Amino acid sequence: MSYKMSRAAYANMFGPTVGDKVRLADTELFIEVERDFTTHGEEVKFGGGKVIRDGMGQSQVTREGGAVDTVITNALIVDHWGIVKADIGLKDGRISAIGKAGNPDTQAGVTIIVGPGTEVIAGEGKIVTAGGMDSHIHFICPQQIDEALMSGITCMLGGGTGPAHGTLATTCTPGPWHIARMIEAADAFPMNLAFAGKGNASLPGALVEMVLGGATSLKLHEDWGTTPAAIDCCLSVADEYDVQVMIHTDTLNESGFVEDTIAAIKGRTIHAYHTEGAGGGHAPDIIRICGQPNVIPSSTNPTRPYTVNTLAEHLDMLMVCHHLSPSIPEDIAFAESRIRKETIAAEDILHDIGAFSIISSDSQAMGRVGEVAIRTWQTADKMKRQRGRLKEESGGNDNFRVKRYIAKYTINPAIAHGLSHEIGSLETGKRADLVLWNPTFFGVKPDMVLLGGTIAAAPMGDPNASIPTPQPVHYRPMFGAYGKSRTNSSVTFVSQASLDAGLAGRLGVAKALVAVQNTRGGIGKASMVHNSLTPHIEVDPETYEVRANGELLTCEPASVLPMAQRYFLF
């Protein structure tokens, strides 16, 4: 017997379905459900008097017989590949299926079997995304990891050894000894971690040593001397050992100009950090490299998006991060050369048209580790308000823009760094590193963060209360952050060469060491999902005006942003 429900009543009970629209936080971004994998009238839902009960939505199937470990019911998936309603089955710490959950003995079309051994996470009215990846981390303090996790980041890649001055300025873990200590420390944290070695050397020996020591990538930084010789040497080692290279170019143009850097790269794949230039790089025209087919350009979040306060805060940040002195005129000139409103404004637009591919943090080194998602969606909102709908959109929604922007901190950094076989998207077979969001708090404050299918973090009320919700409610580590569950639910990424050289046996760490792969000639700008545009970029050396394919790129700074003070009263 059929039963008719209004759309509002259905959405309140089972979450939105095809044709329904959802607003993301307090932005002007609206998504529309494209497909519903569940079956109307056969939805599964947990609770008193609900469907997932013995003999109803719960079968007798054992785990060995095919029942999943966890089912997330009626979730709204937001990923680069689609915006869909589905049940999500998790097994062995991975996504086992996306489809229709239930009891195959009583329901048709079941692709996710719910059994007595299945836990339920209620996804009705929630958005589920892949865990974010922050690919520009200065490992200055371990407390960053908690901050990132609670914001929805489940993988952090970068370099450092703590608050050493090299780490305060550069994302490098120099030498195999320091890399080993950081890999050992990784066991203590509920986070997928990956470490970058220092790439600044004119001879390959020391770089090879770091790759064999476990570095997943090599970082070229101007503070260590990013000369053409160092660039060429570093990329040659990377090509031999299949690791990525990240570059922060020469702001002062001492060893060459942007043309010389492009020539030294020789068409090889490279990830260009803070390609706009405020974070560092050839002044004033490093932004030109975002038009190169072999360059994967990224932003760090202090310039995301361009606001009335952006320029004012950057000078002091830069002086601290790069060990500069306000009493030395040359240091002040160095800092001021990097901060240009024209290129920062252009950066907004280049993100919106898909010419910049990645957004990351630059944690504690001119960036905020807990604001990768927030700054990404603030940029998307600002661009919609200023530029209107994208030409790629169809229907009365912002689905394409949302897919473009979520790719910037999920799948694209994963592809760039050889991790997309494990993380970066919500797809069958990948790690179950997932984030649940209430749409009202989307991008700002997660409802729950899973690592390897285990709940690692969530907001939680007073532990002595009779129910979980009484104040004070704040983020707390969950069971996935403790004991062996911590080391089993997350991994440390390393180079394949280091595993072949016996790194796991030498270090004896508890976490699994997983190799990066396909970081070199197999990828490039064209591999960046929804963010692969390569326009011809020109920068006026006098006015700093930026043009893409002849069109002036400029926009006004925002004076008000969504996802800001409204969400952070306390």
From Swiss-Prot:
Keywords: Cytoplasm, Hydrolase, Metal-binding, Nickel. The active site is at H322 (proton donor). Pathway: Nitrogen metabolism; urea degradation; CO(2) and NH(3) from urea (urease route): step 1/1. GO terms for biological process: urea catabolic process. It is found in: Cytoplasm. Its cofactor is Ni cation. Substrate binds at H221. It is an enzyme of class 3 (hydrolase). The keyword Nucleotide-binding does not apply. Ni(2+) 1 binds at H136, H138, K219, D362. This is Urease subunit alpha.
